[in-house]
Each structure stands twice: as C-alpha cells, then as structure tokens.
C-alpha cells in the first residue's frame, strides 16, 4: 500500500532527552528526518503503538504504550563508545510510529509499509511494539526488501525469544498476538525450518501447538531443556548464538524477535 503522512506519526520531541554540556545522550544524536528519501543509516527505529491484536487474543491491553516507554528510556542513555557516533551523529534514525486504526489488517499493512521504508534506508531496523502480532508484518517487510535488494529469494530466518509459540489459528480470519508465526508459515513467508522458538515453555502452550510446530520442522528450544543443558556447561547465551549463526548461514536476512513475556516477572504482560 502507498504510505502517506497520515499513517505515520513523528517521535514526540519530549522523548528526545538532552543531557548537560559534555554529557551527550542518544536523544541528541538520533535523526528524525522524514521522509527517508536519500537517508542511509546503520540503524532505523520504527514503532507500532497498537495492542488490538492482544485484545483479540483475550489478553490485557497496554502494549500500545510500548514504543514511547522504550524510547523514553533509550534516549536518556549515553551513546556507545563507537567511533561511528563521533564521526557521524546521524548513524541511526527514528522514523516514528505507524498510526493504528480500528482494522487490524489495515494496521498490519501500514506497519509493513513503514518497516519497508526503514529497511531501505538502513542496514538494520529495530521495531518496537505493540502486540506481538506485529512480528508478522515486520517479517514480511524484511522478506520483501531482502528479495528486492539482493535479487534473491528473500529467504529469511527468525529467532523468537518467547515462552509462547504463537502459532494459534486465526479467529474470524483475523490475526492476533497469538497467530504471527502460523500466519508466516501458512503464507510461505518463512520456511518453518528457519524458525527458532527459543525458550518456549510447556506450561504456556497447548500440546497441539507443539505438535503442529514439530510436524513442520520448526526448531523448538524448550526452556526447561535449555536450563538442563546449562547445568552441564552449555550456557543459554551460547545456545542462542549457535542458533543465530545457523540462521545467518541459511538465510539472506535474519530477524530476532523478543517478547516481554520472556523476561522474568513479566509473564502475561
């Protein structure tokens, strides 16, 4: 779909924190230039401040505030000790948020369009949610841009850190926060063998959903098995790195999705 200004909102200037003299913060270095025509950065941030998909999945609303909450903390931080930030303060940009409406399918198309624009302007995109249903349109954006830029098939890999598998069936043919990876597999956006469900928990998913994934070759890293392996010397960060390296070797581009449910004390958020 054509992406016009009415579907995008710039970052709230109040979130762009400014430090004292000699104490520069990320809020002073990020570029918020729009449109992204002619922009080339290493990292571009986009937001999807929408939790309609969480509501449709019978979850608690509130994730719509995620992009602003994350930016509020991020832009107070000091820049990394990286020469790139000293030489080029425009090393990363923030393209703002897609503007959600009442139709979740339209919202997803808007998010995909904004993400595609960001991917064309940068080497990597950090997409802030919002409900986890936005993993699907962001993955579609990655596949489309990857195929176009590299004149390739657009083979993507996804490593998702989440206790939930998120392979529920749609209800009333609508996507929601429990459907993203089933939608991506059913829609042939991703080869199921290129999907790693890292940290899935048996007490957070139906047995039928585990079976559905295994029948299709999805790689499941069960949390309890990761913990057992850690006790014999296989650290969880090392297991994560190995899976990521495998996906990089098999794919044109890779997406990492982190759901807050994976954080201690936040299950159900």
Spans of features found by a protein language model:
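Conserved alpha-helical scaffold segments that buttress catalytic/binding sites
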Residues: 2-269
């Amino acid at each position: 779909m054509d992406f016009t200004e009415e579907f995008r909102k710039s970052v709230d200037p109040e979130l762009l924190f400014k430090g004292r003299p000699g104490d520069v913060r990320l809020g002073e270095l990020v570029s918020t230039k729009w449109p992204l025509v002619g922009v080339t950065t290493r990292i571009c941030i986009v937001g999807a401040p929408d939790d309609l998909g969480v509501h449709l999945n019978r979850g608690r609303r509130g994730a719509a505030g995620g992009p602003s909450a994350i930016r509020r903390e991020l832009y107070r931080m000091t820049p990394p000790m990286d020469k790139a930030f000293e030489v080029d303060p425009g090393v990363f940009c923030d393209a703002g948020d897609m503007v959600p409406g009442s139709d979740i399918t339209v919202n997803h198309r808007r998010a995909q369009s904004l993400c595609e624009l960001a991917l064309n302007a940068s080497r990597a995109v950090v997409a802030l949610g919002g409900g986890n249903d936005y993993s699907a349109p962001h993955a579609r954006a990655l596949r489309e841009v990857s195929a176009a830029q590299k004149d390739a098939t657009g083979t993507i890999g996804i490593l998702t850190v989440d206790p939930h598998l998120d392979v529920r069936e749609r209800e009333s043919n609508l996507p929601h926060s429990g459907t993203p990876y089933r939608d991506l597999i059913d829609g042939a956006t991703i080869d199921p063998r290129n999907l790693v469900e890292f940290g899935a928990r048996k007490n957070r998913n139906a047995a039928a959903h585990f079976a559905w994934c295994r029948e299709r070759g999805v790689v499941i890293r069960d949390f309890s098995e990761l913990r057992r392996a850690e006790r014999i010397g296989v650290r969880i960060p090392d297991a994560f790195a190995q899976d990521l390296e495998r996906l990089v070797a098999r794919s044109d581009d890779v997406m990492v999705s982190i759901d807050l449910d994976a954080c201690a004390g936040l299950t159900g958020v």
